Amino acid sequence: MKAFMLAGISSGIGKTTISMALMSAFDNVSPFKVGPDYIDPGFHEFITGNPSYNLDMFMMGEQGVRYSFLKHHKNISIIEGVMGLYDGIDNTLDNNSSAHLARFLGVPVILVLDGVGKSTSIAAQVLGYKNLDPRVNIAGVIINKVSSAKTYSIFKEAIEKYTGVKCLGFVAKNDSLNISSRHLGLLQAHEVDDLKEKLQILKNAVLENIDLVELEKIATEQTRNIEEKVSDIAYPLYLSNLKDKYTGKTIAIAKDSAFSFYYNDNIEFLEYMGFKIRYFSPIKDAVVPECDAIYLGGGYPENFAKELSGNTSMIDSIRDNYEQGKSILAECGGFMYLSNGIENTEGKISEMCCLAPCLVNMTNKLDISRFGYISITNKDGLEIAKGHEFHYSKLKTVIEDTRKFKAVKKDGRNWDCIFNGKKMYAGYPHIHFFGSYKLLEELF
């Protein structure tokens, strides 16, 4: 099989921009994203026309990651890394980083670094990344923000001479390419005007000086041989008892501009469990479609607070379904929708569903005290899920003893994280079902 990972020496180095261009350059690409991010996969899908899947060692486990990677392979798999190559949950080398994942899957790494303010010393940088964990196959480098072809030739000679790593090309310094990273930080793919035109400009600029033939050769020859046929790949055995367990049942999934953060593997796993899926819009629809359960994913409800609050018939329908004992799973933005209300940064409150007894207060900065990977434990201290928190809001006026589950960090820090009433699980954590099947069994 053909595959490679594009990883950077740090965040903001240009790997997303270059990943997008490379995904547009090959045919029938299987796009993947390391970690829990929702935004980048949306751009992957827009570019390739194929679903993009997250590969997260913490939330999915080794078996889950392996399944997803093999099952969804098409002509060539391109994995976009996260943060710096070796950055993970701690400073070990088995830390769920991009390097850890590449090593586990046996795929070559193409390292992205920038050429600003460097000369021969750029080789030392590459050598350091190569030698930190020799088990990681750094098979090539692409240099971003290069001032000229002559400068690149200096970089190339030094890197190949002192490290043995092949230089695959460079991206010229071009401030106009920054538009993509700016959009990626704020908007989803469907919200960017003239995205096709912008991507074509990006593709032309980035691929002008990259050796695609050599890159494809590396992807073909240096990916560890996989014996299994993709069609034979099955879900991990520990998930097999859930196959068709809910046949005949329907789950209604919120999907619109306010709620769009879903892992493709999660949706497919609901179908594997037997659920029929019906989508609805809490912004535009009058009621929840006929169903046995409701799934409210993450997104940006704060940006549509007026519309959501004003759609009182939908709010009443959500409440009615809850009172009827329907199961409700609500993650982050979906949880905010179930709260008593969302208070914006100016102090204005928009009333929501009033099922989770708290008020959500928007802020202008990431809540770093409630950020990152967590294990979710029940009242007996048993882990029922693995998740990730990332939010710019905090809770106010929380009624005590209404949250029955704790978020536990690797360093021992913990906090109450999920509101639980009747058949409702609502909280900030985003979960991947491969590592959270116990929660699903309790809920459904």
Language model regions located:
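Hydrophobic positions on the alpha1 helix immediately C-terminal to the Walker A/P-loop
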Residues: 18
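ATP-dependent carboxylate-amine ligase catalytic core
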Residues: 2-13, 24-105, 113-140, 149-153, ...
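C-terminal and late-domain segments of enzyme folds
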Residues: 102, 206-209, 244-247, 259-269, ...
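Structural motif
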Residues: 5, 78-80, 110-112, 142, ...
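Internal gly/pro-rich beta-alpha loop/helix module
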Residues: 120-239
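Residues that mark the start of a beta-strand
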Residues: 3, 28, 248-250, 276, ...
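Phosphate-binding active sites in nucleotide-utilizing proteins
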Residues: 239-243, 247-312, 316-323
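Cysteine-nucleophile active-site neighborhood
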Residues: 277, 301-378
